[in-house]
């Protein structure tokens, strides 16, 4: 197969992916005793498209899958998509709104039908993009968290947990999105710092002329206050504890209580306690057994009658609220109440105050802590009949503590344990239509029945008219079951037996609690074993300035645009469409034009993957730099061109395939073979320990520097001057080292390595399989490491570097050839044929003593070197003097800039660092120029 003159990724990527899939390489065998390797894809939202985080995550997962496949393991990478309850419902509702229709106009069943229609049309975007990234997943195992198989597992888990007393319905404080009309998880809440105010309000002490002044950022919740708290160690207010206060605007009285939650140094030292509208206050109220007074409706407007509850969820009546505020939004109620407080002389002060405002990540509306009826999983209770005597949380804590589940890097264990040891019961219900409908029904009296089907439930309530609960389950509930539901549970399948636990989960740190911990809980509880052995936590991909990539910032990069390239107008359109804050569009356009004046060039999948791998150090966030992607695109070109050179020099010739023919290896051949063994061992260790950054660096250094820049160049000398046995050994080494390097690189750059391997492998006598994907992973043979050859190569490199430095000092252009004289051991004569080529020499000789000439001398190991070139001393002195003068001037200017008062403190850190590096380079250059001038003198 003849290689094209240049590497064009688009010409090979789709072709090879289709071939791999058609050949069945992505599928495991269910009839084998080989060790198994399984990995679960964190299921992306069905609404989503591939972003840089996905590309990063999937590069690591595919790299591991390809690595273990080549090692001979029975590999399975399970793909899937999450139904993404809230996100999907919003998308479809927006489409309906454009037609002037709401979901309520359609009704539940028709609306859900519309969602399924949308999913069938649009839901495959991310899977087609995964193919572009080269993901070798078993597409036959692809699941959707709402498909029949997954839904059966979800229902089964819910029913079993309910029967074990671990699922219950209760009234609790939850994050409530009033615009969506549903509870949301903490992950769907973004707290943003905003300019607000702190109001100081008087609360008169009953039976006294004293008042206490309470500082609050939310005066509209005052109607639901049940107490005012002080710190028990605050001497100023200890005498007030137990006293009653008049609650402004209500006619009620509330007590002063002491609680450690209060920071005596913040505000006035008094804190209003409103447990029905604040999570911290809820905990304070629970400790003091106060009432819960709910003053808001589900649309975040004020009620006419407050609802009063106990912490056990029991209704305790109602309280009339001022009619003037009934039906007002929280913002309007705040204005009205502040005016009334001011008129009553109870508003003391208003101060500017920066505060964190929780907003829904999809709606932007303020999230209200609200008391609502929800379904919960009991996290710290032992299930009925559980022989382990442990809660689902404790089982998950033990799994990590015992080492059955290992975090990489291990510092994330502390984060995991901190969350687990402070866990609250999990709110699993959502007031949506799209999702797994809760398998619970109610009779006319409101009694709940839970079962797998209506028929099963009806048998428990004969003669009763049953109404199904309209809520759906939190998306994270079904995601938590993926390690076993995706493999056929509750049925006992061969896949469950073979692939649980999986070897590793690859994910970001932001979902350790929401997903990782819950998978460990559910799998240990239902299967009695862990879902995975390792959890590899990687950082977040940020933009080049370290900012989080987000649509609102306009700095999102589509990985496919890096693969295929994109013109500037299309890129601007992409970045400014659908902004939550359209007013930011001009700013985004300006930034995009500055960063990508010509758009984004096409880098190809392999360069993108290698870039991602190079960033995959343990747990660190990634500032994505396009220059690195460009560098690795050049690396692909280097690998391609080196292979073309090798093929042109070996094709049709004897490459040492006939083992009976003599082979005469030079020290250069032995050196590259030695380095290859060390590379095989080091890359294997790097991948075994998830150090993709090290693996990519090792491969890059070996291929670019050692193989291409040194060995291939030296092989030219051997092919030109060697005898038949030497040439045969060189050709054999060229192709065999390249073939192994391609296999080592394949997990990171699958497409280019496959294309090149198909050409190289037959000549290396290594084409034992039809694809590099299933070729054997290289195993180092340390007996092939030749220490003597490596030592000689080190000396030779010193010699060549010294020659190059001499050429630089003497200002010799690339076309100028000069004779080299070496004063040193006779063994240096072996190096000279190679040095002639690499040092651009007209001749080279080992002599007893260097000639007496006006030429600089260099030291390399045991040798002294001289390039004998007639130099015009006067002209060279003038040139060096001029260069020294310019360098001194540049050093002086840069030093003055860095010493300028305030520059280092006020200028951007990147700019200061660049200036310091430039100064160091200039200082070094100046020292070298002065040394050259001194030698001439």
UniProtKB/Swiss-Prot annotation:
Protein name (Swiss-Prot/TrEMBL): Valine--tRNA ligase
GO biological process, one term: valyl-tRNA aminoacylation
Entry annotated with the keyword ATP-binding: yes
Native source organism of the sequence: Laribacter hongkongensis (strain HLHK9)
GO-annotated cellular components: cytosol
Single GO term (MF): ATP binding
Motif ('KMSKS' region): 548-552
Recorded catalytic activity of this chain's protein: tRNA(Val) + L-valine + ATP = L-valyl-tRNA(Val) + AMP + diphosphate
């Amino acid at each position: 197969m003849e290689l094209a003159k240049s590497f064009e990724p688009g010409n090979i990527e789709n072709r090879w992916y289709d071939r791999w899939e058609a050949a069945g390489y992505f599928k495991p065998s269910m009839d084998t005793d080989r060790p198994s390797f399984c990995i679960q894809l964190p299921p992306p939202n069905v609404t989503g498209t591939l972003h840089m985080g996905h590309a990063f995550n999937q590069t690591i997962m595919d790299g591991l899958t390809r690595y273990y496949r080549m090692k001979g393991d029975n590999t399975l990478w399970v793909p899937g998509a999450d139904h993404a309850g809230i996100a999907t419902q919003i998308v479809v509702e927006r489409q309906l709104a454009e037609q002037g229709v709401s979901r309520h106009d359609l009704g539940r069943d028709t609306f859900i039908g519309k969602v399924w229609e949308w999913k069938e049309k649009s839901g495959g975007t991310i899977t087609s993009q995964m193919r572009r990234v080269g993901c070798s997943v078993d597409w036959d195992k692809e699941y959707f968290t709402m498909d029949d198989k997954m839904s059966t597992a979800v229902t089964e888990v819910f029913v079993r947990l309910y029967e074990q007393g671990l699922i219950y319905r209760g009234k609790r404080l939850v994050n409530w999105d009033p615009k969506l009309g549903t509870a949301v998880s903490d992950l769907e809440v973004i707290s943003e710092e905003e300019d607000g105010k702190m109001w100081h309000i008087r609360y008169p002490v009953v039976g006294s002329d004293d008042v206490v002044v309470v500082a609050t950022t939310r005066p509209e919740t005052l109607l639901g206050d049940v107490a005012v708290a002080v710190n028990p160690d605050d001497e100023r207010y200890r005498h007030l504890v137990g006293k009653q206060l008049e609650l402004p605007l209500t006619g009620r009285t509330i007590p002063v209580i002491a609680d450690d939650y209060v920071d005596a140094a913040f505000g006035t030292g008094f804190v209003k306690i409103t447990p029905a509208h604040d999570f911290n206050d809820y905990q304070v109220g629970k400790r003091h057994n106060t009432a819960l007074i709910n003053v808001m409706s589900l649309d975040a407007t004020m009620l006419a009658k407050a609802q009063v509850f106990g912490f056990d969820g029991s209704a305790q009546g109602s309280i009339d609220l001022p009619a003037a505020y009934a039906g007002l939004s929280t913002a309007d109620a705040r204005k009205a109440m502040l005016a009334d407080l001011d008129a009553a002389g109870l508003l003391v002060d208003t101060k500017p105050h920066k505060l964190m405002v929780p907003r829904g990540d999809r709606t932007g509306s303020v999230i209200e802590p609200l008391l609502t009826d929800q379904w919960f999983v009991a996290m710290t209770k032992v299930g009925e009949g559980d022989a382990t005597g442990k809660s689902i949380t404790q089982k998950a804590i033990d799994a990590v503590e015992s080492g059955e589940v290992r975090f990489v890097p291990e510092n994330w264990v502390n984060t995991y344990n901190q969350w687990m040891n402070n866990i609250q019961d999990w709110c699993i219900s959502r007031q949506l239509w799209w999702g797994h409908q809760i398998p619970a029904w109610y009779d006319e009296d409101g009694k709940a029945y839970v079962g797998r089907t209506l028929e099963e439930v009806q048998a428990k309530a004969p003669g009763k008219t049953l109404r199904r609960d309209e809520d759906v389950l939190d998306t994270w509930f079904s995601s938590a079951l993926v390690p076993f539901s995706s493999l056929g549970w509750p049925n006992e399948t061969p896949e469950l037996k073979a692939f649980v636990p999986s070897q590793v989960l690859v994910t970001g740190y932001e979902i350790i609690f929401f997903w990782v911990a819950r998978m460990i809980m559910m799998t240990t509880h239902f299967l009695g074993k862990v879902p995975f052995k390792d959890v590899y936590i990687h950082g977040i991909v940020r933009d080049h300035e370290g900012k989080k990539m987000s649509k609102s910032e306009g700095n999102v990069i589509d990985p496919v645009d890096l693969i295929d390239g994109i013109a500037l107008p299309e890129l601007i359109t992409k970045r400014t469409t659908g902004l939550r804050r359209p007013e930011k569009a001009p700013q985004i356009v300006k930034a995009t034009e500055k960063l990508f004046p010509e758009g984004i060039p096409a880098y190809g999948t392999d360069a993108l993957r290698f870039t991602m791998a190079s960033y995959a150090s343990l747990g660190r966030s990634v500032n994505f730099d396009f220059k690195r992607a460009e560098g690795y695109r050049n690396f692909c070109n280097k690998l391609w061109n080196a292979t073309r050179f090798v093929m042109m020099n070996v094709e049709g010739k004897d490459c040492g395939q006939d083992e009976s023919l003599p082979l005469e290896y030079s020290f250069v051949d032995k050196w590259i073979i030695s380095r290859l063994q060390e590379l095989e061992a080091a890359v294997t260790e790097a991948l075994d320990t998830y150090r993709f950054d090290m693996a990519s660096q090792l491969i890059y250094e070996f291929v670019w520097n050692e193989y291409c820049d040194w060995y291939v160049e030296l092989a030219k000398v051997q092919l030109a001057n060697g005898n038949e046995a030497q040439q045969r050994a060189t050709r054999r080494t060229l192709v065999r080292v390249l073939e192994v390097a391609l296999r080592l690189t394949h997990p990171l750059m699958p497409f280019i390595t496959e294309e090149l391997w198909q050409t190289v492998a037959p000549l290396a006598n290594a084409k034992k399989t039809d694809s590099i994907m299933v070729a054997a992973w290289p195993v180092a043979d340390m007996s092939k490491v030749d220490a003597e050859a490596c030592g000689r190569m080190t000396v030779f490199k010193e010699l060549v570097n010294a020659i190059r430095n001499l050429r630089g000092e003497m200002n010799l252009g690339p076309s100028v050839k000069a004779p080299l004289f070496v004063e040193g051991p006779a063994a240096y004569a072996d190096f000279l044929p190679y040095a002639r080529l690499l040092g651009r020499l007209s001749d080279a000789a080992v002599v007893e003593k260097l000639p007496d000439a006006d030429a600089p001398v260099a030291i390399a190991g045991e040798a002294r070197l001289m390039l004998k070139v007639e130099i015009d001393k006067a002209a060279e002195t003038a040139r060096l003097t001029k260069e020294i003068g310019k360098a001194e001037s540049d050093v002086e200017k840069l030093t003055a800039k860095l010493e300028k008062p305030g520059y280092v403190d006020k200028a951007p850190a990147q700019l200061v660092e660049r200036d310091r590096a430039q100064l160091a380079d200039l200082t070094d250059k100046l020292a070298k120029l002065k040394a050259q001038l001194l030698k001439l003198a």
